[in-house]
């Protein structure tokens, strides 16, 4: 498979390898006619950097020729190589302030296991997660705390909703789409009717939306659904996702994602009609239990919690206390 494909005049999709599923991330190179912009970076692995170098060579440029980096969000596959790329190119780096803060926290978290943080231990216990039954080594992804995550933590420019980044003769409009991550943005090229959507509008899979120990009391799934409605207001002819193939009907896909989460929420609430349950108890029934890798069990619990909190926000469920645990029940 070619590492780079021109998907629209002057806009290139680059395929970079990942050591986990999904196994490929699509990043996007934009020829701004006098400047080159990279939207998302891949992770900071030798394999990914080499693939990026080979892709750029196909259009006769090098990493050192990049003028700007624009990140949809801080996750390793989207922003992990930003530090190395900026070091080599001096590219002006753009990211939402919330994402830059989270990138810094991820580096700090990489120096310790999740169960070493008192606030995390209390959060796990409150939501029924039997932390003592799992090996601490499995409680975080293998890349955390390694050089594969080398993000810029002090970007050159913070971006926010409605900002327009002018690079060369292109205008990149920032649309804030919180949900998958609090500072997630999609990038809209209005003249071209092209939307680079990061993980917000994936064509085949649903992006993870969860509540984590550092985000207790938030409603990310509510934000995600609102963001799906928000992007439908824009005139788009070509959708460029971070995983999966390019496609055209962003409104149809946005509605599919909303319907999926509404169905999943109803499935979870049905399990609580006879008696209230913790997020972990519900997740074990919906996604499978402790035979799965611990990191997957954690993610499933946090995703379940996001659905339950949305139901509480919207008046379809209530939370209560069962000893020292928080439990949920459908109304």
Q: Model segments located where?
A:
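C-terminal regulatory/interaction regions
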Residues: 266-331
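Active-site HxH/HxHxD metal-binding segment of metal-dependent hydrolases
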Residues: 43-49, 57-164, 193, 248
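Metallo-beta-lactamase
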Residues: 36, 43-47, 137-157, 164-166, ...
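Conserved beta-strand hairpin/beta-sheet module of binuclear metal-dependent hydrolase folds
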Residues: 2-61, 65, 108, 187-200
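Aromatic/hydrophobic pocket-lining residues that form the small-molecule binding cavity
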Residues: 52, 224, 304
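Divalent metal-coordination and catalytic microenvironments
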Residues: 10, 30, 40, 73, ...
